[in-house]
């Protein structure tokens, strides 16, 4: 049935494209030969960031493709990324909006997908000043420590019964509850039991459906049909999670007291002071963006880090030695400790270099024709920046495919968008606003897992847990989850 749907929709698209007489724009960057109807869709493969990196080695760091009806630009070098994300930032600042995101008109109020406008600037200001500012993060430091302690307690419980820990899932639940406490001052899910399972699952389902290849996105003529039902499915997920947010907002408003000091309080006060600029819809859209974008990044990075360290025991041993020397074996890593743990920080940077959570940064869309390095980029062009390829560029990185944290010991490179050789969170005005939280959470979670346990492979798991195969999605996780047994150090 799926095959028949795909074939029929492609044939319909071909007829419409032929009737409309869509031709190839002039003076595009080089790229592979296109096929009728599908263009270069067949070249994307199961892991597009890897396929695009291979194509860039043939056609160059500024490459054009035709994905169905959509002219596409792929950026695969630090120099080209700097041109797009910094020097011509405004020309490339508009987000491409996937059809599924248009469910409930989410793109009209989303900090991730709004074009640069007054509403977008207001949302960025709220996020930067009240969630991810240094003062806000310092005030919630005790909360992050508590959530890490809960993670370590869970691992200790697993150790008592010699059970394995699904590292990615445990880190995901920790991140989810941290965010819910930051926004609502309460857990929305029990981290390791079934209570609150619905909320956890609906957030996961949104991420899963966001990652599905949607024919509508490459053949917009099919928009009204939604042949795969992806937008309809997303609407169901949005309805559930927005309903939960409605209940929490109404519960707080009934009290008439905004004394928690959390993000919800800040938003409700803004709504009271500026009802024409900020309303219920804005609040719920902001919360949805925060949960979808803010839970996966940390957990995926932790899972890749633990996998790399288990594959390189000498690097894990060196990290453990540093932790024992600086804070003492068996201690929880605090945020203030991280500055005294340079090797741990190098490990985090190296993981983000090799395994950026979103290897293809959220795509941009060119609104008006622009010139780039002598090429003409027409209006409507989709723009991908391949952070995965940039982080593995052999002209920039020695032994570019090797996990070598020591490369950062004498380097001042950071991940905050200033150095275009390393942009796991993007750069420019569209840079991920959650960097300050991610760069605090990852080292304290990873360091605490290393400093409290040794880890062994669970022979009962029916696959190689150290397999490095990637699983495609909006973020890139391991295809085979890391499930390992903790052994307490004291």
UniProtKB/Swiss-Prot annotation:
Documented EC number(s): 1.14.-.-
Known function: Capable of dealkylating a model xenobiotic compound, 7-ethoxycoumarin. Metabolizes with high efficiency a wide range of xenobiotics, including alkoxycoumarins, alkoxyresorufins, and several herbicides of the class of phenylureas. Catalyzes the double N-dealkylation (oxidative N-demethylation) of phenylureas such as chlortoluron and isoproturon with turnover rates comparable to those reported for physiological substrates and produces non-phytotoxic compounds. Could be used for control of herbicide tolerance and selectivity, as well as soil and groundwater bioremediation.
Protein name (record): 7-ethoxycoumarin O-deethylase
Pfam entry (one): p450
Keyword set includes Nuclease: no
Keywords for the protein's UniProt record, in alphabetical order: Heme, Iron, Metal-binding, Monooxygenase, Oxidoreductase
Cross-referenced Gene3D superfamilies: Cytochrome P450 (1.10.630.10)
A GO molecular-function annotation: iron ion binding
Induction: By aminopyrine and other xenobiotics.
Gene that encodes the chain: CYP76B1
Family indicated by similarity: Belongs to the cytochrome P450 family.
CDD domains: CYP76-like
Binding sites annotated in the UniProt record for heme: 432
Top-rank lineage group of the source organism: Eukaryota
Cofactor(s) the protein requires to work: heme
Organism: Helianthus tuberosus (Jerusalem artichoke)
């Amino acid at each position: 049935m799926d095959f028949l749907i795909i074939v029929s929709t492609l044939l319909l698209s071909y007829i419409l494209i032929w009737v409309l007489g869509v031709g190839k724009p002039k003076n595009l960057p080089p790229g592979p030969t296109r096929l009728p109807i599908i263009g270069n869709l067949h070249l994307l493969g199961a892991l597009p960031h890897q396929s695009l990196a291979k194509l860039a080695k043939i056609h160059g760091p500024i490459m054009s493709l035709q994905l169905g009806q959509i002219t596409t630009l792929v950026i695969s070098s630090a120099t080209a990324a700097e041109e797009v994300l910094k020097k011509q930032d405004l020309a490339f600042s508009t987000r491409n909006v996937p059809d599924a995101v248009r469910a409930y008109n989410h793109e009209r109020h989303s900090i991730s997908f709004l074009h640069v406008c007054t509403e977008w600037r207001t949302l960025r200001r709220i996020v930067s000043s009240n969630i991810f500012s240094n003062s806000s993060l310092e005030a919630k430091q005790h909360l992050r420590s508590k959530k890490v302690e809960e993670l370590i307690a869970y691992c200790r419980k697993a150790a008592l019964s010699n059970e394995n820990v699904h590292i990615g899932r445990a880190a995901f639940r920790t991140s989810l509850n941290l965010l819910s406490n930051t926004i609502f001052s309460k857990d929305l899910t029990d981290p390791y039991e079934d209570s609150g399972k619905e909320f956890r699952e609906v957030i996961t389902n949104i991420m899963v459906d966001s990652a599905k290849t949607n024919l509508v996105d490459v053949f917009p003529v099919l928009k009204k049909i939604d042949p795969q039902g992806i937008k309809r499915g997303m609407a169901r997920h949005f309805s559930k999670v927005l309903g939960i947010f409605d209940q929490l907002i109404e519960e707080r408003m009934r009290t008439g007291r905004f004394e928690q000091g959390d993000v919800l309080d800040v938003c409700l006060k803004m709504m009271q002071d500026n009802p024409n600029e900020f309303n219920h819809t804005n609040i719920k859209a902001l919360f949805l963006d925060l949960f979808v974008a803010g839970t996966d990044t940390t957990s995926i990075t932790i899972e890749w880090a633990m996998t790399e360290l288990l594959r390189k025991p000498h690097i894990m041993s060196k990290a453990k030695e540093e932790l024992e020397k600086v804070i003492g074996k068996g201690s929880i890593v605090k945020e203030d400790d991280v500055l005294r743990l340079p090797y741990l920080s190098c490990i985090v940077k190296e993981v983000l270099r090799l395994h950026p959570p979103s290897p293809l940064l959220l795509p941009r869309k060119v609104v008006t024709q622009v010139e780039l390095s002598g090429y003409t980029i027409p209006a409507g062009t989709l723009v991908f920046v391949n952070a995965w390829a940039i982080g593995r560029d052999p002209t920039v990185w020695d032994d570019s495919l090797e996990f070598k944290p020591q490369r950062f010991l004498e380097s001042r490179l950071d991940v905050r968008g200033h150095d275009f050789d390393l942009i796991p969170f993007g750069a420019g005005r569209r840079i991920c606003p959650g960097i300050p939280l991610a760069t605090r959470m990852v080292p304290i979670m990873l360091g605490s897992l290393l400093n409290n346990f040794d880890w062994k492979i669970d022979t009962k798991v029916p696959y190689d847990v150290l397999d490095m195969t990637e699983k495609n999605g909006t973020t890139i996780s391991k295809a085979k989850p890391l499930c390992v047994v903790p052994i307490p150090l004291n």
